[in-house]
Structure formats: C-alpha cells, structure tokens
Amino acid sequence: MTETVYDVVSIGNALVDVLAKVGDTFLSERQLKKGNMTLVEAAEAGKIYADVIPERQVSGGSAANTVAGLASLGADCAFIGKVHDDELGQLFQRDIGAAGIDFFTAPLTEGPATGRSVVLVTPDAERSMFTYLGAARKLTEDDIDEKIIRDSKIIFIEGYLWDEATEHQAIIKACELAHKYNREVAFTVSDISCVNKHREKMLELIQEHVNILFANEEEIKALFETDNFEEALEGIKPMVNIAAVTRDSRGSVIVHGREKIFVEAEQIEDIVDTTGAGDLYAAGFLYGLTHGRSLGTCATIGGITAAEVLTHYGARPEVSLRGLVRHKLMAYGKRP
C-alpha cells in the first residue's frame, strides 16, 4: 500500500446553512415536514428564508461537517464538492480552508447558485432542513480526483448524493478508485428520507462497495424495512466490515463480524440543536479508526464530538475537539 497524505477525504454536498429558531406552529402553518431533510427549489427556499430571522449563516453540508470535525481533532483531510463562484460559494471556500481542509474542486462560473439549507430549529432542539442543492447537484465524476483518493486512508461519502445520475456516477468512480488503491469506503445513510427514496440503490452500493457504515436506529430499520432493531443489525452484519449505529440518548452500537459493542451516550444537560450530531459522531469515530484506536474507543470519541455540537447552534464545533477529547478520555481512564 502506498503512503497516504490524508486520513479522510469526504465527498458530499457543499452547502451554506442558514439557521433559525422557530416554533412548531411555524412548520404546521406552512405544512413543512418536521425532523427531516426536504429538498426544495430556489424559490421555496427563498420564501422560507424570508419568513425567518436567521441566527447564523455558516458553511455546512453533511460530509463537509464531518471533515471539519476531523480537522478539529487534528486529522489531515480533503473535501470534494461543488459550489458556484458566488458570495456563498466564496464563504464556503474560506471556511473550509480556514479549518485546514484541502478543497480543490473547481467552482461553477455559470449555472445554479451555491446550495443552501434553511435549518429550522424548534424548542425541542429538533432540526428540520429545507435544502436547495443548487451547484452541489453539478458534481460529476470529472470532479473525483484520482490522486486525492489514492492519497487518502478512508473515502467518506454522504447519503444525500443521489438525486442526479451524475452524482451517482461520481460516487461509483470514487468507490472503484478506492478499491483500486486498497482504500476503505465509509458511507453515511444521512437521513431517513434518503433511505425511503433510494433504498435499493443504497443497499446495492453498501453491498458492493462499503466497508464502514454510519446510520441511526431509525435509518437502519428503514433500510431493511423492519421495526425490529436487532433484525436490522443482523441484516447489515454480512454486508460491511463495521457498522456504527447511533441511538440518541442510548448511545451507539458497533457491529463488527460476530461482535457487538454497546457504548453509552455522553450526558448532556441542555440540548440546543441536533443539527450535525450524526456528522460529528462520524468524525470522532473515523478519527479513532485512522489513529489505531479500538472500536469501543472510536465510538466513545464519536459520542464526545457529537455531544459538543448538540450544545450550540450550528453543525461545526466551537471548541478544539482535540483538546476536548483528550480531556474526556483521560477522565474516563482511557489513553488520550
């Protein structure tokens, strides 16, 4: 195996998140679906945006959030995704560069604007996302840089990349290159709406290409069309090397061959916003995995990094995750 430059390269939608606090009536009056990611066109996104008072406007996107978390932990990372060379696209490029992440994908100079996600957070801290993908949809296999794939230990792909045939082709090219260079492919299901729309394609991708799977309990059950959690775990077991399944306040379950590892969740006094919790769990887990930690410790790190993002608005960490994880692991009697 050749030497690597990056611990992880992630591939996903490059978006800017607009975060706003709303009441449940805001959603019900507009017949907006709570708790999921809903794709909208530019006009609808603009209409929702006009009706809220934004708390923050920050770079986002699931896979981009994950590498931002990894970079905060001290990992070497790259990102592949598409923006337009407009104001929001330049904001995204500045933010990801400031985080220490290599981002070489050429921006669009014409066509759709940079994608944005209006993230509405209700008093129960649940996030409802209304996403205009815009330029993000224009990712093609030409954007998949063979050298970056070759130079990365793990290729991390988000489940939101399904709505355009060209995006799917890009995913397959990345997976095939990963196998060519004996790299591992990690995949996050991302959202139950993605599962319900693309179940068969997802299962095919997982079966043929994925080594490491991330999902939450509801997503894994939806993937196998069952209400039985244990049945879903049995379904995924022969398909991947590692499955990391989160269960909110009940922690996470790691499935590896015949082994099941149960890890408790971090205790959080006040959950402010659930946006990005799954993204940051994946960041912590992958950091542990690329740095030789046991699967149990990987899950513990994932729990720590997910917990940090639950305590504030936005999906990017607000403290040094490296220092936080070191402190927490020492407190738990684990090697920092």
Q: What are the residue ranges of the model-derived segments?
A:
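Glycine-rich phosphate/adenosyl-contacting loop at the front of the ribokinase-like
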Residues: 1-80, 90-91, 98
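Conserved phosphate-binding/catalytic region of the ribokinase-like
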Residues: 1-9, 14-15, 28-36, 176-177, ...
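Alpha-helix C-terminal capping segments
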Residues: 67-76, 120-122, 288-291
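Hydrophobic beta-strand scaffold residues
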Residues: 77, 103, 185-186, 243
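A glycine-rich helix N-cap at a beta->alpha junction
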Residues: 95-112
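Conserved phosphate-binding/catalytic loop of the ribokinase/pfkB sugar-kinase fold
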Residues: 104-108, 119-164
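Conserved beta-alpha-beta core of the PfkB/ribokinase-like small-molecule kinase fold
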Residues: 154-234, 250-252
